[in-house]
Swiss-Prot record:
Positions with biased composition (Low complexity): 456-479, 722-741
GO cellular component: nucleus
UniProt KW Nucleus keyword: yes
Name the UniProt record assigns to this protein: Pre-rRNA-processing protein RIX1
Gene that encodes it: RIX1
Organism: Candida albicans (strain SC5314 / ATCC MYA-2876) (Yeast)
Length: 769
C-alpha cells in the first residue's frame, strides 16, 4: 500500500481510520521509505486532525501520532512537535463548552487516548539520552501537572502513569511528592474510609502502590523513610485492634497483652508522622458502625501489603517479626477464648462483632499469602507459629473437640484462604515429621468438599415434623378422635428422600481446587493416621468415579489424576493397597502400568566382600605353596633319578682335591642350575675326610658298587660338597636372574644335564672338628 493512499484518506475527515492505523502499524516499510515531502504532508495533516474541534477527528489524530512515532526517524525529527500538540489537547480541551448544558466537560475517550499516547511516546524516548534531554525532560513538569489536574477523571490510568514517572524520574517528581500524598490520603480517608472501601479493587490497589512508591523521591536515606512508614502503619493497626477491648475481656488471655506490648505504639497527633486514617466513632445505637473497624483494618493492611510487594530502587530492612506478630495479634482476638463484657448483651451487636472479626481474619490471610509468595523460604522458621494461630480459627466444640461443620460452611471463603496458605507453605517443605498440627486442617478440608444439602430444605423438613408432632400431642390432650386424612405436607417432602441429589447445592470451584491442591501436598509431605488417610482415599475414589462416569468423554480431570497417582506412590500406613481400584479408574495410565506389569531388571548378585577376600587369600597361599613344592621336588627327583652320575662326580672331585689344583669352571650350567659360580677353589684334605658322604672303595677293576638299587632311590637329606667358593658359595636368585641373558648359550647344555650342586653345610664341619 502506498503512503499516498494514507495521505489522501487523512486529508479531511477519515472515513475509516482503523484500517489505516493497522496498515501503518504492520507494514513498517511504508514509514521507513517515506520521502521528506511525504513526511511533511503526513505530519501537517495529522496535526490538523489533532487541532480539530470535532471529537472523532481529534481521536483519529491522536491515535495516528501513536502509530507513526514507532518509526525512529519520525520520532527524532518530529517528536517535539507531536508532543506539544498532545499537551495542547490536555491544556485546552477542558475549556470546551458543552453545546447543550453549557458546562465545562472533558471527553474521557480523548483524555485517555491522549494520556496513553504521551505514555507510549515517553516509553519510546526513555533510555535514549539525546531524545530524553531534548523532548521528554523539558515537558515532564507540565505532564505531571496535567495528570494531577485530571486525576479525578481517569484515576486508574493516571495513577499507573504517575507510578512510571515516579520510578524513572524521581528527581523531577520530588516537588510534587507532598501534593500527591495529600491527594491519595484524601481519597483513602474520604468519608471516614466508607467511600474508599467501595472503590474497585484495581483502583484501591493502584492507590496503595502509588503511596508505597513515594519514599523513592526522598533525597537522603529513602530506605529509612520506607522503614518508618511501615512501623507507623503497624502502630496504627495496633491502636485500631485495641478498640476491641471495649467489647471483649482481653484479660482472659495474657498472651494477647504480651503481643500488644511487642508492637509499636499508635502515632499521636503530636508526632510529625501523618496518620492515614482519622479516628473512629462507634455508636452502639448504630451497630453498623462496628464494621468500620474491619474497613479501616482492611485499608491499613492493604497499604502494608503494597509496601511489602512494590519494588524499590534501594535496599530496605523488612520488619518481618513485627508483621507476623501483628497477624498473630489479629487472629488471637477470638470469641472462643475471650468473653464479652457485661454491658454487651444485644445479640445483634455480638453477631456484628463476630462478623467483624472474621473479616479481620480474611484481611490477615491476604497479607500472609502475599508474604509467603514473595519471601518464600524466609518464612520457614516461622511456619510452626503461623500454623498454631491459624489452627485456633477452626471452630470446634469444647466438649468433644469436634469441628463445627455449620460454621465452616458459613465462613467458607475464610477457610479456603487458610487452606491456600497451608498449601503454599507445605510446598516449601520437603517433609513434615510432626503431623499432629495439620490434622485439623485435613478434617476442615474434607468438610468443605462434603456433599451439601440446601439448608432451607432441611429446615422445612424439621419444622413440618415438629408441627405434626405438636398437632398430635394437642389432639391427644384434648381427647379428640383424630380423623384419618391424607398428609398433604409429606407429599412434597417425599421428593427429598427419593431424589436427594436434586436438592444438593454446588460447591464453588475455587473451594474444590484449593482443597485438592492442599490434599495433594498433604499426601506427598506427611504420613497421616489411618483415620484421616482413609477419609482422603474415600473422597478421591468417589470423586474420580463420579468425574469419569458422569461426563461425556469419561475422562478423569488432571488434578484428580495427579491425586490418585500420588495416593499410589505415597501409601503411608495403608495396609491394603488401593492400586487395583485406581488402576480400574485410570486404566490407560502408563505409570500405573509399571506397577501392574512390572518389568524388573535381573536381580543383583550380592557378594560377601569379607568371604571373597578370604577365599582369594587362601587361593593365593595355595598357589604359593604349590610353586614352592614344585621348586623343592624338582631337584630331589633329579637327584634320585641320576644317583650314579652324582657319585661318579664326587669321586672325581676327591681325586682333584688331592692335587691341590685350582679347577676352572668351564661349563657352569652343568654344576649349578639355580646359581652362578664365578670361581671354584679346592679345600684341604682334612675337610674332605670329615665329609659325611659315603663313597665305596674302588676295586681293582675300578667298578662302582652301589649299595641301594636304582629302582628304589632313597632321599638324601644332607649332601655336603667337597668344594667351596671363595667369593660367594651360593649367589642369590637375583644375581642368577640378572645374568640369565648372559647364559643363553648354555641353555641347551642345562637341559641335557640333571646334576645340581648340593648345599655345603659348614656348620657340620665345625662340629666334627
Amino acid at each position: 500500500m502506498s503512503i499516498n493512499i494514507v495521505l489522501e484518506e487523512i486529508k479531511g475527515t477519515p472515513s475509516s481510520i482503523i484500517p489505516l492505523l493497522s496498515i501503518l502499524h504492520n507494514d513498517k516499510q511504508i514509514l521507513s521509505t517515506i520521502t521528506k515531502t511525504e513526511l511533511n504532508h503526513l505530519i501537517s495533516r495529522t496535526l490538523n486532525l489533532v487541532r480539530s474541534s470535532d471529537v472523532y477527528n481529534k481521536w483519529c489524530g491522536i491515535n495516528l501520532i501513536r502509530v507513526i512515532v514507532e518509526e525512529y526517524s519520525i520520532l527524532a525529527s518530529e517528536g517535539n512537535n507531536l508532543m506539544n500538540s498532545l499537551l495542547q489537547v490536555l491544556e485546552a480541551y477542558q475549556q470546551q463548552q458543552h453545546h447543550h448544558h453549557h458546562q465545562t466537560t472533558i471527553d474521557l475517550k480523548i483524555l485517555t487516548s491522549c494520556i496513553e499516547t504521551i505514555n507510549y511516546m515517553g516509553d519510546l524516548i526513555r533510555g535514549k539520552p539525546t531524545l530524553t534531554r531534548e523532548i521528554l525532560t523539558p515537558k515532564l513538569n507540565s505532564i505531571i501537572g496535567y495528570y494531577f489536574q485530571y486525576l479525578h477523571f481517569a484515576p486508574l490510568l493516571i495513577l499507573n502513569s504517575l507510578q512510571t514517572l515516579l520510578k524513572f524520574h524521581p528527581t523531577t517528581f520530588r516537588p510534587f511528592g507532598n501534593k500527591l500524598k495529600t491527594k491519595l490520603i484524601n481519597l483513602i480517608d474520604g468519608g471516614g474510609g466508607e467511600e474508599f472501601i467501595n472503590y474497585p479493587q484495581d483502583l484501591q490497589l493502584s492507590i496503595y502502590n502509588t503511596l508505597a512508591m513515594l519514599p523513592i523521591i526522598e533525597k537522603i536515606e529513602p530506605e529509612t523513610k520506607w522503614y518508618n512508614d511501615v512501623i507507623n502503619i503497624l502502630g496504627e493497626i495496633n491502636g485500631l485492634i485495641q478498640i476491641y477491648q471495649e467489647f471483649l475481656n482481653f484479660k482472659d488471655d495474657q498472651d494477647l497483652s504480651n503481643l500488644i506490648q511487642k508492637l509499636p505504639n499508635r502515632p499521636t497527633t503530636t508526632t510529625t508522622t501523618t496518620k492515614l486514617l482519622t479516628d473512629l466513632s462507634i455508636d452502639f445505637n448504630k451497630p453498623q458502625t462496628i464494621l468500620s473497624i474491619s474497613n479501616h483494618l482492611n485499608i491499613l493492611m492493604g497499604v502494608l501489603k503494597s509496601y511489602l510487594t512494590v519494588e524499590t530502587l534501594f535496599t530496605v530492612k523488612l520488619p518481618l517479626g513485627l508483621i507476623l506478630t501483628t497477624c498473630e495479634l489479629i487472629c488471637s482476638i477470638n470469641t472462643k477464648f475471650l468473653s464479652f463484657k457485661g454491658d454487651i448483651r444485644d445479640e445483634t451487636i455480638k453477631k456484628l462483632i463476630k462478623f467483624s472479626l472474621i473479616e479481620n481474619y480474611k484481611t490477615t490471610l491476604g497479607v500472609l499469602i502475599e508474604l509467603i509468595e514473595l519471601y518464600k523460604g524466609s518464612l520457614i522458621p516461622h511456619l510452626t507459629t503461623i500454623w498454631s494461630f491459624l489452627e485456633t480459627l477452626i471452630p470446634f466444640q469444647n466438649q468433644n473437640k469436634r469441628i463445627v461443620n455449620e460454621e465452616i460452611i458459613e465462613s467458607e471463603s475464610l477457610y479456603v484462604e487458610i487452606l491456600q496458605f497451608m498449601k503454599q507453605s507445605l510446598s516449601l517443605l520437603g517433609n513434615v515429621s510432626e503431623n499432629t498440627q495439620l490434622l485439623r486442617f485435613v478434617d476442615m478440608a474434607l468438610i468443605l468438599v462434603e456433599p451439601r444439602i440446601n439448608p432451607t430444605t432441611t429446615t422445612t423438613t424439621t419444622n413440618n415434623n415438629n408441627n405434626n408432632n405438636n398437632t398430635k400431642q394437642t389432639n391427644v390432650q384434648q381427647g379428640k378422635k383424630q380423623k384419618k386424612r391424607k398428609n398433604t405436607s409429606s407429599v412434597a417432602l417425599s421428593d427429598i428422600l427419593s431424589h436427594e441429589h436434586l436438592f444438593m447445592t454446588n460447591i464453588p470451584t475455587i473451594t474444590i481446587t484449593t482443597v485438592r491442591s492442599f490434599i495433594n501436598q498433604i499426601i506427598t509431605k506427611i504420613i497421616l493416621p489411618p483415620t484421616q488417610h482413609y477419609k482422603i482415599m474415600r473422597y478421591l475414589i468417589i470423586e474420580s468415579i463420579h468425574a469419569k462416569y458422569y461426563n461425556l468423554y469419561h475422562n478423569v480431570p488432571i488434578e484428580l489424576k495427579k491425586l490418585l497417582i500420588n495416593a499410589v506412590l505415597y501409601p503411608g500406613y495403608d495396609k491394603i493397597s488401593i492400586l487395583p481400584i485406581i488402576s480400574t479408574i485410570l486404566s490407560d495410565d502408563p505409570l500405573l502400568g509399571v506397577f501392574n506389569n512390572p518389568k524388573f531388571p535381573p536381580l543383583p548378585k550380592y557378594i560377601n566382600l569379607v568371604n571373597n577376600i578370604e577365599e582369594e587369600e587362601q587361593k593365593e597361599e595355595q598357589e604359593e605353596d604349590a610353586i614352592i613344592e614344585d621348586e623343592v621336588e624338582e631337584p630331589i627327583k633329579e637327584e634320585l633319578t641320576t644317583p650314579l652320575k652324582k657319585r661318579k662326580l664326587d669321586i672325581e672331585s676327591n681325586e682333584e682335591t688331592d692335587n691341590n689344583n685350582i679347577i676352572p669352571v668351564e661349563d657352569q650350567s652343568k654344576i649349578f642350575t639355580a646359581t652362578k659360580v664365578e670361581k671354584l677353589t679346592t679345600t684341604t684334605t682334612s675337610s674332605i675326610e670329615n665329609n659325611p658322604v659315603v663313597i665305596e672303595e674302588l676295586t681293582s677293576s675300578k667298578e662302582i658298587v652301589v649299595e641301594s638299587p636304582v629302582d628304589e632311590p632313597t632321599k638324601v637329606d644332607n649332601i655336603i660338597p667337597t668344594t667351596t667358593t671363595t667369593t660367594t658359595t651360593t649367589t642369590s636368585l637375583t644375581s642368577n636372574t640378572a645374568n640369565a641373558n648372559d647364559d643363553n648359550d648354555n641353555d641347551d647344555d642345562d637341559e641335557s644335564s640333571d646334576f645340581e650342586m648340593p648345599e655345603i653345610n659348614l656348620d657340620q664341619d665345625s662340629d666334627d672338628e
